[in-house]
Regions:
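Short, glycine-/small-residue-rich phosphate/pyrophosphate-handling segment
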Residues: 10, 14-34
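Single conserved hydrophobic/aromatic residue that forms the stacking wall/gate
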Residues: 1-9, 13
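Internal nucleotide-binding/catalytic subdomain
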Residues: 54-196
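Short gly/pro/ser/thr-enriched loop/turn and capping motifs at secondary-structure boundaries
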Residues: 6-7, 49-51, 115-117
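Short glycine-enriched loop/turn motifs at secondary-structure junctions
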Residues: 16-18, 48-52
């Protein structure tokens, strides 16, 4: 799966994989127009890799602008050359891991991590403050839906593009009222989730 947040979203939209509505922006002025014209709460993401710290969940339009400005001002180097503004979706997060041989996959136990720095899900996101496995909210029905709607279409897309990927695929998901949605892909284990799975 691509390491760019923008390309991940584009792949999801193209293959009807459930994800959040998004906008890609390449300047602060472009971002401000979207931030001030939309009525839905937004999440701000650096487009490239940022060690799990490139996501901001602002509480206001002003915080949204400040987060976007900090990314464009070089907070994450070249990973912040483009910014993704994303619809803020609600629900608990869950991490699902698949080991892929290029064609087939096997699932590992699910996990839930806690990213916020402070208690009661407050403060900035971190690389991970703690985790547990398996994720109790991931019922058999949800897992079947995740396999059908997210995991298999993702693996099929890699195969269609002749991407012979061998390794772990980390599906960062949010369980919303309308079902599971992709919030991120990674080609690595999550940390600290991996510690609880092992």
């Amino acid at each position: 799966p691509p390491t760019s947040s923008r390309r991940q979203r584009q792949m999801c939209i193209r293959d009807s994989i459930p994800t959040a509505k998004f906008w890609k922006v390449s300047s602060l002025e472009e971002a401000k127009k979207i931030i001030h014209s939309t009525s839905i709460p937004l999440v701000v993401k650096a487009d490239g890799l940022a060690s799990g710290k490139g996501v901001f969940i602002p509480d206001s339009k002003e915080e949204c602008v400040r987060a976007t400005e900090s990314i464009f001002n070089g907070k994450f180097g070249n990973s912040g050359n483009m910014v993704v503004l994303e619809e803020k979706i609600h629900g608990p997060e869950v991490s699902v891991f698949a080991l892929c041989d290029g064609k087939k996959y096997i699932l590992l136990p699910s996990a839930q991590d806690h990213k916020r720095l402070n208690e009661e899900d407050k403060g900035p996101n971190t690389g991970g403050m703690g985790a547990y496995s398996p994720a109790p909210l991931l019922t058999k029905n949800y897992l079947e839906r995740i396999i059908k709607e997210i995991i298999e279409p993702t693996i099929n897309e890699l195969n269609k593009k002749n991407i012979d990927y061998k390794g772990v695929i980390y599906f960062g998901l949010m369980i919303t009222k309308s079902g599971p949605k992709v919030i991120e892909y990674n080609c690595r284990f999550g940390d600290p989730e991996c510690q609880t799975i092992m």
